[in-house]
């Protein structure tokens, strides 16, 4: 990681053009639509299987969910940078290089958000929105979990309200996906990831990093 380059990235001004990123997210999803939907089905099935196992089913999903779901970030970054990908790339988050940091991002970020919610709600909402880029920062800049959380918070804070509105609309889209007999979520959830990663990549993407090429 080049600390000076990252510091410069965190000082960038940017605007969140909601219409642009919904369109760009959809355009990015199309080349990987089948694999992406298949990956989310795999996540769903893994959670169903784990949930059926006594004791383990109460712990394992929480441990592996963040590293597993982060796989879509690797693939979307590869597509945006004109790189090829294989289905196995969806599971890069489970590798030794990334697993612990991604798990800690989920654990610590989640705990801080919950604490914020307990203190008058608003701090929790602020942190929930602020940490939206933590996973992309971790895998793209090889950051440790707290560095990734802080990098995301600093960047989002420059246009927090715009990012908040984007996430509200993404949330509404996913609610609509659930209302469509529950199956629509397998389209809206991958699209949500594409939208968020497209925005991240335009603002802070580390195009010199080979994370999207190496396990």
Predicted stretch roles:
Residues 50:
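Midchain, well-structured core segments that form catalytic/ion-binding scaffolds
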Residues 2-9, 13, 53-85, 113-150, ...:
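Selective recognition of hydrophobic, aromatic-rich stretches within alpha-helical transmembrane segments
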Residues 16-46, 84-115, 127-178, 208, ...:
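Interfacial aromatic "cap" segments that immediately flank transmembrane helices
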